Amino acid sequence: MMTAPNVVQSSPSLALSFLSDLTPPSLERTWLTAPHPTLPLVATCSSDKTVRVYSLVNFRLLSTISGGHKRSIRTCAWKPNVSGESVLATGSFDATVGIWRRWDDYGEEETLAQGNKNTKNFGAEEDREEDEDDEWRFAVLLDGHDSEVKSVSWSASGMLLATCSRDKSIWIWEDLEDGDNNFETVAVMQEHEGDVKCVAWHPAEECLASGSYDDTIRIWREDIDDWGQVACIKGHTGTVWGIDWEDAENVPFPSTSNGVSGQEEEWKTWHALSGPRLVSCSHDQSVRVWRRQPKAQLNTAGASSIPSIIRPSGTDETWEEDVVLPHAHELPIYAVAWSRRTGLLASVGADGRLVVYEERFVSSHTKPQAMNTDEVSPNLGEGVCAPHPSTEWSIVAVVNGAHGIYEINHVAWAKRADRGRDGNKEEEVLITTADDGSIKVWTLTR
């Protein structure tokens, strides 16, 4: 049986430092900041019915997108795997989803992402024309939800867009990429019993997760042309405000003790079987990590062998709670972000606190032990052990009152692109978004 991670409440060991505000900010509540997948850009959505696009090179406003929605813009997401232009989806309290396009004329995409000499032009908003806003084209309006749109998310391929709403539904749209900005409705799922707060696509597969006011997380997959629920994850005792997936290649930090070996390979083996984990945050003030049980496999040791575990066939999945992270918030937690580069987790919420967590291997590696059929992992035969290395989670950095007295609505990781970065390594920044309209950028150092 897989060894559950330990939870360690420790003194912060990393330093979170304020780097810059994104300026000028909105004068109204700002909900979310979405980093561009390749360029040093972020998009922020606001109650003033606009999306502001900022440079991460000099933290200045590049353009303001407006005119497409009649009420607050609650959410936005960049389409991945697009060449030559940027495509942004926006979700609004007016119950619609907008698709915006803009040709990438800041310079060569690759050189901009690397932050070399061309980045100077990218960050120099003073060189821009007054009609910058007109360069964003309102391509299409997706209409279908009956109430406020709360979250939008593109699949890893960029072909599918998921949207969710206060109307308790999740819609999946396919971008036909026919040159006419046509989208087709692929599925409408209505199993949630409350306002659906968030959706997030698996980092590699066409698998969708959602969180809701009904306190559950649900997993969705397509089976023979029909989308349906394959898991309903229960454990939170309050609204699930945010979810995020672990990177498919994530490996915990090494143990601080010497003499620990083999854990990384064992981890990768288990990771390949169960796939990326899912993290969630809730009104119940907890951050929880969930892991999918691997599908049952047949024991093929001999011709007469039979499965050691009899499980129903079909698409249903079993998800288990991997760990509850150390308690760090005193009020509802609104957002959580799992770094694709380092595996660090960050959370923010109504208490104005920014918290960073780290997972490490521990030296007290549980030795493999034979187990009975009631305890065996579903992917293993009778008496076979599950040598999963032990890990522990700890709080490594905390900032209280990160935006003064204001609630923090969102947190995101992004690649650092300003001139103060270390050019010899790939650094990250944290971006927090708050009720007062401010967006702050933070660095994390050991």
From Swiss-Prot:
GO cellular component: cytosolic [4Fe-4S] assembly targeting complex
Pfam family, one: WD40
InterPro entries to which the protein is assigned, alphabetical: CIAO1/Cia1, G-protein_beta_WD-40_rep, WD40/YVTN_repeat-like_dom_sf, WD40_repeat_dom_sf, WD40_rpt
Keywords: Repeat, WD repeat
Keyword Repeat: yes
Disulfide pairings: none
SUPFAM superfamilies xref list: WD40 repeat-like
GO process annotations (BP): iron-sulfur cluster assembly
WD repeat intervals: 22-64, 68-110, 144-183, 191-230, 235-300, 328-367, 402-446
PROSITE patterns to which the protein is assigned, alphabetical: WD_REPEATS_2, WD_REPEATS_REGION
Leader sequence residues: none
Family assignment from sequence similarity: Belongs to the WD repeat CIA1 family.
Protein purpose: Essential component of the cytosolic iron-sulfur (Fe/S) protein assembly machinery. Required for the maturation of extramitochondrial Fe/S proteins.
Protein name, entry field: Probable cytosolic iron-sulfur protein assembly protein 1
Species this protein is from: Emericella nidulans (strain FGSC A4 / ATCC 38163 / CBS 112.46 / NRRL 194 / M139)
UniProt gene name: cia1
